[in-house]
């Protein structure tokens, strides 16, 4: 997609080299799609935060679509995603991608719910902890990815065991 529409560039570095490289940035990015965001390292930092926000947005879409998929209304999720792309406050390129995935596989039955992470979310959480900045939405999104990679969760087994032990609640064996 970047090759077709250009790349959003978050450039960090000293002013002189950035000015010298401006023609390259302008060529690679769509109109208003690049910015000098600060000194050395600032570009990577802004990209890290960008990717953390992306994790959170995807998690929100995933949870909302799961709720609709489990509703009693037999909703056409691809149609709803398309609808939301026209004038809704939640419209985005990620929603366009969701609509495409739902058109191809309306209940996502061809996929496993295994979600990898590439590290940016971890780095952002570590930085947030260091700076005493709460990032609960991102933390939930990252931890949900971790959970998606477990075939059996020891924590969930422990919860079942504890509920059974203190209240006689049913367990599955």
Where do the PLM segments sit?
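A common structural junction motif
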Residues: 28-32
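Helical "substrate-binding/catalytic lid" subdomain
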Residues: 6, 10, 20, 41-169
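Active-site phosphate/pyrophosphate-binding segments
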Residues: 34-37
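Phosphate/pyrophosphate-binding betaalpha-module
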Residues: 16-27
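Long, positively charged, glycine-interspersed low-complexity recognition regions
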Residues: 172-173
């Amino acid at each position: 997609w970047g090759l077709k529409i250009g790349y959003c560039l978050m450039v960090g570095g000293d002013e002189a080299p950035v000015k010298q490289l401006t023609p390259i940035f302008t060529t690679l990015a769509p109109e208003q799609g690049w910015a000098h965001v600060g000194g050395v390292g600032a570009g990577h930092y802004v990209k890290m935060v960008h990717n953390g926000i992306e994790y959170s947005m995807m998690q929100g879409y995933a949870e909302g679509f799961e709720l609709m998929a489990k509703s009693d209304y037999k909703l056409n999720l691809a149609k709803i995603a398309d609808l939301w792309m026209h004038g809704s406050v939640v419209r985005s390129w990620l929603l366009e991608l969701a609509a495409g995935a739902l058109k191809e596989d309306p209940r996502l039955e061809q996929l496993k719910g295994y979600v990898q992470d590439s590290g940016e979310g971890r780095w952002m959480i570590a930085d947030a902890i260091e700076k005493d900045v709460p990032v609960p939405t991102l933390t939930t999104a990252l931890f949900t990815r971790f959970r998606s990679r477990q075939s059996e969760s020891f924590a969930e087994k422990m919860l079942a065991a504890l509920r059974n032990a203190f209240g006689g609640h049913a367990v599955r064996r």
